Each structure stands twice: as structure tokens, then as C-alpha cells.
A protein has these predicted regions:
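Short aromatic-enriched loop/helix-cap "lid" or pocket-rim segments at secondary-structure transitions
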Residues: 32, 39-42, 136-139, 187-190, ...
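Solvent-exposed, non-membrane alpha-helical residues enriched in polar/charged side chains
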Residues: 71, 113, 164, 194-198, ...
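A general structural signal for well-ordered alpha-helical segments in protein cores
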Residues: 109, 160, 193-194, 251, ...
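C-terminal substrate-binding subdomain of Rossmann-fold SDR/epimerase-dehydratase oxidoreductases
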Residues: 200-321
């Protein structure tokens, strides 16, 4: 099968590409190789180089999904499937620059959908977010009413509706993925787990915004497995899937676990960040039944793996915190 992965050098993206390569699929990647200022360019260059080492046979196009290059790639390769992972990396970046966020998350998505329609792609897998739910408690299903808070979640939900509309018009089938708090080796520095881990390793203060706020932390290997299944399993057509560990852990618990694993760092409790919804664990029964999805890595093992990677990488240094 010929598959295009947008954002294929991202944290989840390069793990998806590795799995597709291992299964013998012909893969192409389009990636603009930026995190929109989340981390210094030198650190991003290191992460991209390390991710590329794990990819053996895929074609790489360094370009934006808003560029004409995307349509050229689709014309040249005649893809069966597009896995659309390219996006702004997190809510605070979109809130700080909503116009640029909309350019990537909406204009870029429309560019993909139009090229998919024009070049007869059979399936588009759209990576959405658990942020579309807004506030929710444990065991939220894909059929829950979505009330996103903030522009990131709103745009992700609008993206879902756009994808569904192209399917309604007979252009291609789709699968929609709602992941949560994905982490693991080769992640960037500005997400919860990576920030906690590096701060602890540098002997700093882990600032916990809302001790009892919970997240459904998901190890990157599990997330990648679910996305690949959604791209390949015929029964996934036109369905939405929560792809997470389906287990909520409080921010305080996560910080305490990391401090214990690293044997360094201290914890400071702060008020909840008002810009972020309160979240719990997602129900993954549909993904289990349809995709055979079975997440393997619990938080304790995942944090251990992540710490081991940091210790052996050139990414971290004992900076002043």
C-alpha cells in the first residue's frame, strides 16, 4: 500500500512511519520540520536527526502542507491512504498565534482533503485530539457531546467535521483518532511529561498546575499502534476512535513518580491553569473491538523508558532551572 504521512518526523509520526515500513508499505513523508518556536532550533535539529535514523526507506519531502508541494506529491505517488498528523503541537501555541494556527490546522487540512479527492485517495486518517471533548471525567466515549475550550480544540473538532463532509460527498472514507497526552523517547521539551522529566534531571522545581487535575498519559508506541491499525483495518472506515492508555493519572502523581524515578527534583503546587479543561481517562472499547487495539505500556514503565532514553541522549544537559 502507498501511504503518505504528514508530520512524519514528529514524535508520533516517525513511530507510525517505522511501523508502516516494517510491514512493507511504501511510505512518503511531508514535514516542515518546525515546532513553531516551542524549543530552540538546535534542539529540534537534534531530535529530527535522531528520528530520521530510525526511518530506513521512506521518501522525505521538507515542505509545508499548505504548499503546492503537497498536491505534487499526491499526483506523483497516487497514494492509497493519507495519515494526517501535521498540526500545531499544542493548545498554548495556537492560543498565542491563532492566525498561524488556523493556517496549518484548517487551510493545511483543506489542502490535504482537496488533494486526496483529486487524486483518488481511498482513506484519510485524521489525527484529532481529546481536547475536542472539553471538560470530561473518566470513561468518556467517542459518542459524548464535544464542548471544546480554546482554539486548539475548536479547530480540531472543526477538522473532524470537514473530514466527515468529504466522506459524505463520496470522496473517500476516513478514520478519526483522538489521542491524549502522548509522551516517550524523542519528544520535545515543552509538554508535561518531558518538562517534568528534564526539570527533575536538572535538579529543578516541578511546577504542578492543579494537583488533582488528571491526564490519560499514553506511551508513544501504543498511540502509533492504534493509528496504524486505523489506517489499515477495513472495518475502521468512517469511525472515530479514542487511542489512549485509558487510565487517568493526576499531575501530582505524575510529578511524584518522576521525582522518584530520577531521584532528583522537588515539587511546587500551583493553581490549575484556567485555559485548560479538566480531563480524565478515555474509553477505548471501540478501538479494542474494531482495531484490536491493546495498549501495553503503563505509566510507570513508560516513565522509566523515557528516563532511560534521556540519560543516554545528547538532548538534555544540567541547565539552570
Amino acid at each position: 500500500m502507498k501511504i503518505l504521512v504528514t508530520g512524519g518526523l514528529g514524535l508520533i509520526g516517525h513511530n507510525v512511519v517505522r511501523r508502516l515500513e516494517a510491514q512493507g508499505h511504501k511510505v512518503a513523508i511531508i514535514d516542515n520540520m518546525t515546532t513553531y518556536g516551542m524549543i530552540p532550533q538546535s534542539e529540534l535539529d537534534y531530535l529530527i536527526a535522531e528520528r530520521q535514523k530510525k526511518i530506513t526507506g521512506s521518501l522525505l519531502y521538507s515542505a509545508s502542507i499548505t504548499s503546492d508541494t503537497l498536491d505534487y506529491i499526491c499526483y506523483r505517488h497516487k497514494f492509497d491512504t493519507i495519515i494526517h498528523m501535521a498540526s500545531f503541537p499544542r493548545q498554548k501555541v495556537v492560543n498565542a498565534n491563532p492566525t498561524l494556527g488556523a493556517d496549518t490546522m484548517m487551510t493545511g487540512l483543506l489542502n490535504i482533503l482537496e488533494s486526496a479527492k483529486k487524486h483518488h485517495v481511498k482513506r484519510v486518517v485524521y489525527i484529532s485530539s481529546s481536547m475536542v471533548y472539553g471538560d470530561f471525567e473518566d470513561d468518556v466515549t467517542e459518542d459524548a457531546v464535544c464542548r471544546p475550550q480554546g482554539q486548539y480544540g475548536i479547530m480540531k473538532l472543526a477538522g473532524e467535521d470537514l473530514v466527515k463532509d468529504y466522506t459524505r460527498r463520496g470522496c473517500f472514507d476516513h478514520a478519526i483518532i483522538r489521542p491524549s497526552a502522548v509522551y516517550g523517547p524523542l519528544d520535545v521539551e515543552d509538554r508535561v511529561v518531558s518538562k517534568f522529566m528534564l526539570t527533575a534531571m536538572r535538579g529543578g522545581v516541578l511546577r504542578v498546575n492543579g494537583a488533582n487535575e488528571t491526564l490519560d498519559f499514553t506511551y508513544v508506541d501504543d498511540a502509533a499502534d492504534g493509528i496504524v491499525a486505523a489506517a489499515l483495518v477495513p472495518a475502521a472506515a468512517n469511525q472515530t476512535f479514542n487511542i489512549t492508555k485509558s487510565h487517568s493519572v493526576s499531575l501530582l502523581q505524575a510529578a511524584e513518580m518522576i521525582v522518584k524515578i530520577v531521584a532528583n527534583g522537588t515539587i511546587e503546587l500551583r493553581d490549575k491553569d484556567a485555559d485548560f479543561p479538566s480531563r480524565g481517562a478515555l474509553n477505548i472499547d471501540r478501538a479494542r473491538a474494531v482495531l484490536g487495539y491493546d495498549p501495553q505500556v503503563d505509566v510507570a514503565e513508560g516513565f522509566d523508558n523515557y528516563h532511560a532514553w534521556f540519560k543516554n541522549s545528547l538532548y538534555w544537559a544540567p541547565k539552570t532551572v
